[in-house]
Amino acid sequence: MKDWDKAYQEGETPWDKGYASPAIAEWLQKNSLEGGVLVPGCGLGHDVRLLASHNNQVTGIDISQTAISKAKAIEVVNNESYRVADFFNLAEDYSQSFDWVVEHTFFCAIAPDLRQSYVENLVNMLRPKGYYLAVFFLKDPSQIDSEGPPYKICREAVEKYFWKNFNLLDSFIPTSHYECRPKGSEYVCWMQLK
């Protein structure tokens, strides 16, 4: 398992581009969200601040103490909070606590053998009929490898893990993306708990 705190301590964080996910920002241009929001694997909180700027109560969690300390040191936008926490050990603390879970490639940062557990925890944290907005790294099924993180995923795997518990409301390949990522490498899904 990757030592996420060490990566933040040593500044070895190529995934941190210094600003919020362009794909999430693109989604927010056409949609709104209301209620409590959880951002797992929030890192330095760029997505947390973007979501909080839309007048939401947003909680960012990360397993890295260093990442959370740095996130807290950045000026507060509005209604955001941060907590050092392991997404896989939040069940009792956050059971049915959120209207939304919004994440940018967090699912792709965890080892594939943890994916089913991720979905179970996600379902437990959402209120009835809660929403899940996710940005996934895409790869053709024939190109999926075990090297990671990130562990890229194909659309068929998204269906396998999520469609049992969620209805798909919308999905798209974002036109906005980090410059270093090729167009078509991200897949945005907006889902609602059944």
Regions found by a protein language model. Name each.
Residues 102:
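A conserved beta-strand element that flanks and buttresses the S-adenosyl-L-methionine
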